[in-house]
């Protein structure tokens, strides 16, 4: 960080011992260590924020570039459509014929959305009830 060697650190330690004395030197060293840690955390936080902002700016630039390409392609398509004119108006104002797919042309009777009670009655007809002994007027 400060590019200091061992001799510079030793000189700072000796000066601090002479100025502060042996009783206050450990407390001062602890305080200096805490401040250095806070400064390092602050600097690393700033570096992370700056790199995140740079990445976001790069993404914005890429997004703008892609948007310009899309706009250019859309402009070409619009020019082609305008150059060929209105196709439906040249046919007498009638809309183009619609095409139906086999799944879209299925009738309502063929769908699976029929209630179960009606679907069951449609699939298997019930046989007529056999006459019982109570219903018959036999002598």
UniProtKB/Swiss-Prot annotation:
Keywords, sorted A to Z: Cell inner membrane, Cell membrane, Membrane, Protein transport, Translocation, Transmembrane, Transmembrane helix, Transport
TM segment ranges: 1-21
GO annotation (BP), single: protein transport by the Tat complex
Principal location listed in the UniProt entry: membrane
Membrane topology summary: Single-pass membrane protein
Biased segments, Basic and acidic residues type: 66-86
Sample GO molecular function, one term: protein transmembrane transporter activity
Function: Part of the twin-arginine translocation (Tat) system that transports large folded proteins containing a characteristic twin-arginine motif in their signal peptide across membranes. Together with TatC, TatB is part of a receptor directly interacting with Tat signal peptides. TatB may form an oligomeric binding site that transiently accommodates folded Tat precursor proteins before their translocation.
Family: Belongs to the TatB family.
Subunit structure: The Tat system comprises two distinct complexes: a TatABC complex, containing multiple copies of TatA, TatB and TatC subunits, and a separate TatA complex, containing only TatA subunits. Substrates initially bind to the TatABC complex, which probably triggers association of the separate TatA complex to form the active translocon.
Record's protein name: Sec-independent protein translocase protein TatB
Species of the source: Chromohalobacter salexigens (strain ATCC BAA-138 / DSM 3043 / CIP 106854 / NCIMB 13768 / 1H11)
Gene that encodes it: tatB
